[in-house]
Amino acid sequence: MDHKPLLQERPPAYNLEAGQGDYACGPHGYGAIPTAPPPPPYPYLVTGIPTSHPRVYNIHSRAVTRYPANSIVVVGGCPVCRVGVLEYCFTCLGIFLAIVLFPFGFLCCFALRKRRCPNCGAVFT
């Protein structure tokens, strides 16, 4: 059974002009972006006589500071030799207080730490 669609069942044509069909806007121009007004006419200049002063351009220069590209800052690096990385070490007094005042002595032990460079041996408090 070949069933051909009737004329009423076919979809509408795609070549509808503006203002036709189901999705047409209301009155013409409603919702459209208004066009810009034409630019004002330019005044006529008389040739041969300069009408304006010559233009002067000001050029400002800025001082640019350049930093060396090979300076690498290591966090925790030794400020004396700039090679070693500082390590924490506990003082003898801090270890003694940690043993004698057992639970609370650890606070004293961590409060009395020093930073030491393994490369040059410098000690920082």
Curated annotation (Swiss-Prot):
Keywords: Cytoplasm, Lysosome, Membrane, Transmembrane, Transmembrane helix. The chain crosses the membrane at residues 71-91, 92-112. GO terms for cellular component: lysosomal membrane; perinuclear region of cytoplasm. GO terms for molecular function: identical protein binding. It comes from the Eukaryota. It is a multi-pass membrane protein. It is found in: Lysosome membrane; Cytoplasm, Perinuclear region. Its main location: membrane. The keyword Transmembrane applies. Interacts with BRI3BP. Interacts with MGAT1 and IFITM3. Participates in tumor necrosis factor-alpha (TNF)-induced cell death. May be a target of Wnt/beta-catenin signaling in the liver. PANTHER family: BRAIN PROTEIN I3, MEMBRANE PROTEIN BRI3. Belongs to the BRI3 family. This is Membrane protein BRI3. It comes from Rattus norvegicus. The gene is Bri3.
